[in-house]
């Protein structure tokens, strides 16, 4: 069971975007995620008339390693570690600090 999934709200722990919050857009592979508004770089794109691409400088969200983000716990207002517990015969993710189920409405 993955600790961080698409749609989760995370907080960045290290790097240029430290303490910035965002939503996970995609899981690139087992170790990297795309986070909305985090690790945005400017890429120079060559024009391609066949694909109707004018080219120029484009802002693109780049992947960030999962070890550099933590799931945001709204109860504490901080990043938190995640554990797995069995509730009603199903495995669910829970915050380690307070035991609340991840994604449950308060």
Swiss-Prot record:
Keywords, ordered alphabetically: Ribonucleoprotein, Ribosomal protein, RNA-binding, rRNA-binding
Single GO cellular component term: ribonucleoprotein complex
An example of a GO molecular function for this protein is: structural constituent of ribosome
Q: Does the keyword Ligase apply?
A: no
InterPro entries associated with the record: Rib_uL2_dom2, Ribosomal_uL24, Ribosomal_uL24_CS, Ribosomal_uL24_KOW, Translation_prot_SH3-like_sf
Q: Which PROSITE patterns match?
A: RIBOSOMAL_L24 (PS01108)
Q: Key word Ribosomal protein present in the record?
A: yes
Q: Which GO terms describe its biological process?
A: translation
Report the superkingdom from the record.
Bacteria
- Family statement drawn from the similarity comment of this UniProt entry: Belongs to the universal ribosomal protein uL24 family.
Q: What does this protein do?
A: One of two assembly initiator proteins, it binds directly to the 5'-end of the 23S rRNA, where it nucleates assembly of the 50S subunit. One of the proteins that surrounds the polypeptide exit tunnel on the outside of the subunit.
Q: How does it assemble?
A: Part of the 50S ribosomal subunit.
Protein's name according to its UniProt entry? Large ribosomal subunit protein uL24
Organism, by scientific name, is: Bordetella pertussis (strain Tohama I / ATCC BAA-589 / NCTC 13251)
Lineage, highest ranks first = Bacteria, Pseudomonadati, Pseudomonadota, Betaproteobacteria, Burkholderiales
């Amino acid at each position: 069971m993955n600790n961080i999934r698409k749609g989760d709200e995370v907080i960045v722990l290290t790097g240029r975007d430290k303490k910035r919050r965002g939503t996970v857009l995609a899981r690139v592979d087992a170790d990297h995620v795309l986070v909305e508004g985090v690790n945005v770089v400017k890429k120079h794109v060559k024009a391609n008339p066949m694909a109707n691409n004018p080219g120029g400088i484009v802002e693109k969200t780049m992947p960030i390693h999962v070890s550099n983000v933590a799931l945001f716990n709204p109860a504490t207002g901080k990043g938190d570690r995640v554990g797995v517990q069995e509730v009603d015969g199903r495995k669910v993710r829970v915050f380690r600090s307070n035991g609340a189920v991840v994604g449950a409405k308060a």
